Amino acid sequence: MKKVLALVLLIILALCLVCCGKDKEGICISVDGEKSTGGALTGEISLKKLSGEYTLYFGDANGEALQGYTKIGEINENTPYKMEKLVIPPDAKTIVAATGEGGTYFAKIPEEYLLNKENAFIFGALSDIHFNKYNKVAEDDAVVAFNNALDYYEKIGADMVGVAGDLSNDGELSAYTKYNEAISGRSFPVYTVTGNHDYNAYKDKSWQENISVGIKGCEFAPNGLDFAFYPNGPDGDVFAFLNITFYSYSYFEKTRPVVSINEQIPWLEGILKAHTDDQVYVFFHLFMCGPDGQSHTGVGNLMNPGGYTYPLPFQKGNSDERRIRRFFKEYKNVVFLSGHSHWAFEMERYNEETNFSNFNGEYCYMVHIPSVTEPRWIEDEDTERTGKNGELSQGWTIYDYGDTVVLVPVDFLSGTVYTEYMEIIHK
């Protein structure tokens, strides 16, 4: 009987714990083995033979806090830190506890929960560059912001960068010239779609002549505008770039589709049907309303206590929107990436779905991309938004490991990586 009891206790211990830090014997990571997965931890972090207040960070193999990463949280001898699907960034090997007095302790993250970055397809997700629109800190703030972001992706070894539209102020040719200059000579391809500010350029064919012509290694749709990128060949994962082909601010035209029902919708549906067992990333400019039909509950939007919300979603109930919404309910292997509202990552405080959600499994995962040039900010009682160009410049670095996707939010200006907004998808 004693042997059976001992065996049971060993099994429970293997499932529910452990990795107590032997380095400096400072902290202990207790892992719930049933709820933790590759790339994310559930359980708790506690102090071991220590007292006082400590701040937790992700660290490297030597127990040094990863540079630029925001804190995980706080801990003291009476209150362990509860991990609820704590996403592990690609470079993390340890969790570090530090005090203001200089005391630092760390514990190793169990290796079975670490993902091998060498096996990942790494891509950046940017939006709303807006050349020629903002000049707070430079002759053209977008030139500085976009080039800085691309330099960041060069440094981390990105394989591709996708942009969710609005390259220009109003479809002007000079914006596309600046865009092409910025992406020229990069070690990775940069692909984009049209935004509402770019629509004029599409209408007069300037887009195809200046942007589409530079897209190589992709399969174009019959309209010569939309295209698919296959990083591992046509039988694997796919990136679909879906463009706005009409846009109007007029109340009388708000029910007119921005995506062609007869051309673009069948093209997108064909890709989705052909890749039900693969990851499908869809880049599109406009964000969707929430499941309740409200703009402010969708991924990509919010409403602050003062009542402000960004007023221009992908119009709920339009014929194109209904079809695409149905796709996103049916094909849960899709990751939908959009921009348009510019909201900074921090604005998630007004809507927990602002940055990322699948609405409890009702839809595919949706991702909001802030503006790389002018992330927007709003306080509780503000009735207008504030542009943070020159102060913030944000986007995502996304690691596709094959069966897991880790999304890492970045501010390119400061080099900050937002630990609290990291997300994970298990395919």
Where do the model's predicted regions map?
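N-terminal active-site segment of His-dependent metallophosphoesterases
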Residues: 114-176
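Active-site-proximal segments of metal-dependent phosphoesterases and phosphodiesterases across multiple
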Residues: 138, 252-259, 275-338
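Extended active-site neighborhood of metal-dependent phosphoesterases/phosphodiesterases
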Residues: 173-275, 279, 323, 329-330, ...
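Recognizes extended acidic, P/S/T-rich segments that occur
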Residues: 58-91
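Beta-strand-rich modules
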Residues: 86-103
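Pro/Thr/Ser/Gly-rich low-complexity, intrinsically disordered linker/stalk tracts
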Residues: 23-49, 105-114
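Active-site neighborhood of phospho(di)ester-bond hydrolases with catalytic His/Asp-centered motifs
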Residues: 125-127, 160-166, 190-196, 282-284, ...
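C-terminal motif of bacterial Sec signal peptides marking the signal peptidase cleavage site
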Residues: 18-19
